[in-house]
Every structure is written in structure tokens, then in C-alpha cells.
Amino acid sequence: MHRYRSHTCEELRPSDVGGTVRLSGWVHRVRDHGGLLFIDLRDHYGITQIVADPDSPSFSTAEKLRSEWVIRVDGEVKARTPETVNPNLATGGVEVFAREIEVLSQAKELPLPVFGEPDYPEDIRLKYRFLDLRRETLHRNILARTKIIAEMRKRMAESGFTEFSTPILTASSPEGARDFLVPSRLHQGKFYALPQAPQIYKQLIMVSGFDRYFQIAPCFRDEDPRADRLPGEFYQLDLEMSFVTQEDVFSTMEPVMRGIFEAFAEGKPVTQKLPRIPYDEAMRKYGSDKPDLRNPIVMEEVSEHFRGSGFKVFANILANDPKAEVWAIPAKTGGSRAFCDRMNSWAQGEGQPGLGYIFWRKEGDTLEGAGPIAKNIGPERTDAIRTQLGLGDGDACFFVAGDPKKFVAFAGAARTRAGEELNLVDRDRFELAWIVDFPFYEWNEDEKRIEFGHNPFSMPQGGMEALENQEPLSIKAFQYDLVCNGFEIASGGIRNHMPELMVKAFEVAGFDRQMVEERFGGLYRAFQYGAPPHGGMAAGIDRIVMLLRGAKNLREITMFPMNQQAMDLLMGAPSEATPQQLRELHIRLAPKQD
């Protein structure tokens, strides 16, 4: 028999009754029932119940066992009595009567419980991550992550993609975040950078004559902590394709992404035909470029109903600013003053003056609008708003007014808040959609200049003619995002593969040819030797796993994450370098600032 086990702790079934087995694992818990000791023995695969009775030579050892000791058990498989069968365990029909127990490793008193999953301070969980990972939910999440990545690889290979690895030590490039810099020992005063994404390398792979590339790529960004992104590093399914249009990317990747969700959705419906929603439409209807389409609320413009009306606040805003609009946020079933007042208080907590509203209720046989706005604009305008929005008895509507560019984010947040408060969001499905036609440029109000809206390497719609003749802020990009349930899970574009077009695009954003040649010399040179039209995308693996597992944050699906202060509490990183290490790197530390 094997030194440690003949079976795993998940394998034994009633068909094994009568056999002698050897199991090894962790002591999950010990229970004393009238002199009999019941030990739940756990390994990577599952749990088996061990029984030690006072007549067994193993009993004296069993009495000493404590949680998370590692033991080996030899014993006989017996059937449980009908009343003791545990239907929640794969091995719940049997138990092993111990003949011999060997302690392989003892455990100190635990700093956090492994049995059960009570809430525990996150810093303790991260410091003792090796214990935290023994807990059932986290253990399953990590295994699911591995299976999801394996499914990605399988589907990409089936779609004709080849997996390539790109360098981890590379040159710094402006991708929208700070680089992690690595000092060079051999080249004094110079630094490598960890890649924020394999963007330039994957385009060079296309120029090199390969047709379809992908990799499970680690990406590194020195960003301030955010709730929806792990500090330091994250992983993405990165891909690129030659000789493709935007629709080619969609038709290739839609079955892959939909299939991954279907494989791990545990029966929840997944969007079959993904809609293409223009960016401007997404902002107008949902107040977000990553809308949660499970929320049925669709915002509409209702400016005409307020122009010249008795509600002077909105009427004056419209009269004094040609850019001003009034948007309506319809809220079916929200027609109570208590709910409307809660929404108004929430808006004030968000730094807004309030949130105007109308709600409708039956007064006898008449459907009437209620609230300050309804009183000021009168029944005819109130009813016109209700008719436009398709609302009725027991429904409500909220309003925001001003320059849409300034209030759109708040309007989107109000839509989300109303949908959640009214339980309008169906949480048992995955709603996927493509967001397309992103602005190529945007206006930086702080610096008073035009800058790239998203990826500077995307192809502008209209090409050189658009760059030379169109107002820059009106130019759209062949840029797209894949969104799911309010999260951006992938982003991509058709690339600008022509060197002069690339230079012109950067010139519009205020950069000259010399800067392009210096910062992107490898790509710029490559484009001068025959570059194919190409495009691709990158999907955030961490977010996809989080969504599929229903995890509350990204740390719940990552094996060894940092905390929100970008510290690895388990390994003690970042740490100070030794004087010798600093000398070899030609680095002298400046005095710490108070």
C-alpha cells in the first residue's frame, strides 16, 4: 500500500464497504459522541468521516488530535446506518473505522478558523493565506479559476489561436497608469518596466506574420487601490488577429466568451445574441459605458416637457444653457413618497442638491401625478411625461437637469440605485453586450487639451480624412468593450497599422513625430515594413472569475493577493533592499520625507 494513501478523502463509496484503506489529510473537526470519536478528515478533494472507538489501538492517538493536524489513517470501510447517512457529502454513505492513526504534522493554535466560514479581519486572512485557502469557498474559487482558464485555452485553440509568451522585462510605455520600474544592474541609470499589457508585442507578432495570437498574460500597473481592480498585478486573456474587421473579432470571440460563461454559469441564463450598443447610446440610456442590462430602467430626455414650464428651476436651466437637457429616470413600482424621499436623501448624500420626482397614484378613477414637480408643471405636462415613459399607477420618475456631460455619471448612479432599491435587477442571469463607437479623443478640462479617449493605437473611423477634416472630439474609434452585469470584462479595437496615420493621430493629441519615434520606435519601424490590418482585445480574467463565482471582491478569487494598500502581508512585500543590493544597482536612497 502507498506510504500515505490508497484513496483520496472524496473517493470512497458504498461499493468500497469491507475494504481496508489508507487516507491522509487534515483534521477538519473532532466530535465526541458517547465515547466514540468522529473525525472529519479533509484533503484537496473532499471529506471522509473517520470513527475511532475505545477498543481500537488508534483511540489513544485520536484523543490527542486537534484541528488542522495532518494525519494518516488506516482502517476498514463500513456502511453508515440509514439515519446517519450524510447526503451533503460525496462520501456520506460510508465511514472508516480507524485501526491505526499516524500524526504526520501538528498545527499550532489557529489564528483564524478553517472549519466554517465566519467573517474574519481581512489582514489576518491575508497574513495566514495558507490557512484561509483551506476554507471551502475560497478553495473552490481557486479551483474554478484554474478550470475557467483551462476552458479559455481550449476554446482559443479550437478557434485557431496559437499561444505565445511575451517579455516581462520591457520598456516603459504610456498606457494610462504608472509603470513598475526595474533598475538595470548592467546599464547604470536605466530601467526596465513590467508590462502594463502586451499591447505592442502582440501587434508586433501580427507584423511578424503570425495570424492569431493569445496568451494568459500577467499585467502590472502601479495604480492607487480601486474596488474593482487588484493592486499591482492582474491577468487577462490577451489576443490579436490579422486581416480582420471589427465584426470579425466579434464573430470569433462572441462564441468563446459566451461559451465560457455558459460552462460555468451553473444554469443561469447567458445572453445568446450580444447586442452592439454605441457608446453615445449607452451613456444616454444608462449613464454608463458599462451598463448593467439586468436593470430594466432606460433613461430618456424629457426637456420639452419642462421648457417654459412652471417648474422654474428646470425651465431656467434650459433657457440659459443651450447644452442643457432634462433626463428622466423612470422607476416602475417606485410610486411612494417614502421611496422618493429616500432617493432624494441619497442624492444629497452624493453631493447633489436633491433629486426631483413625480409619482403617480389613482385618486378615484383619475390617475394623478404627485410631488412638487407635478404641482408646478401642471397635469397636462405631467401626463405627457407619464405617457412618453410608459408609466402608470404606482410608478415614479426622477429627473436631473443641466449639461449631460456633467450629470451623466450621477444619473447613471441614480438609475443603478433605483433598480437595486426596487429589486428590479435579476441577479440570476448574465447579460453580455458589446459597447462600440467610443470617442477617439476626449477633452481634458484640467489641462485644457485634447487627449486620447482610450487606446491610442486604435484605428480612427474615417482614417486620415477624419483626422485632417473632422472636429477631433467628433471622431469615433474602432474601439469596443465587452460588458457584463455592470462590469467591463474585455476591451479591444482594430489597430492603426499605417505609420503616417499613427503619427497624425498623435499629432492631433499634441505629440510630434519625434515623440512617436522615441516612445514607440519598435512598433513605428515595424509598420514601415508591411503591417497587416489587425485587431484584438483583452479580457480581464479576474473580473470574469469574480462574476461567475459570485464573489464579493477580487481577493476572493485570487490565490495570494495584496491588500488594498498594495502590501503582501504573507511574504512581507514590499521590503527594504540591502545596502549591497542598492550598490550593485547604483541606487542611493533619498532621505525619507516627513
Swiss-Prot record:
Keywords: Aminoacyl-tRNA synthetase, ATP-binding, Cytoplasm, Ligase, Nucleotide-binding, Protein biosynthesis
Annotated compartments: Cytoplasm
Residues annotated for ATP binding in this entry: 221-223, 488, 540-543
Positions of L-aspartate binding: 175, 221, 454, 495
EC number: 6.1.1.23
Catalysed reactions listed for this entry: tRNA(Asx) + L-aspartate + ATP = L-aspartyl-tRNA(Asx) + AMP + diphosphate
Gene Ontology CC: cytoplasm
One Pfam family, short name: GAD
Molecular function, one GO term: aspartate-tRNA ligase activity
PROSITE patterns tied to this protein: AA_TRNA_LIGASE_II
Enzyme class (EC, first level): ligase
Annotated site residues (Important for tRNA non-discrimination) in this chain: 33
First-listed, main subcellular location of the protein, grouped into a coarse class: cytoplasm
BP-aspect Gene Ontology terms: aspartyl-tRNA aminoacylation
Top-level taxonomic group: Bacteria
Annotated region described as Aspartate, given as residue ranges: 199-202
Function as written in the Swiss-Prot or TrEMBL entry: Aspartyl-tRNA synthetase with relaxed tRNA specificity since it is able to aspartylate not only its cognate tRNA(Asp) but also tRNA(Asn). Reaction proceeds in two steps: L-aspartate is first activated by ATP to form Asp-AMP and then transferred to the acceptor end of tRNA(Asp/Asn).
Similarity remark: Belongs to the class-II aminoacyl-tRNA synthetase family. Type 1 subfamily.
Subunit structure: Homodimer.
Protein name according to UniProt: Aspartate--tRNA(Asp/Asn) ligase
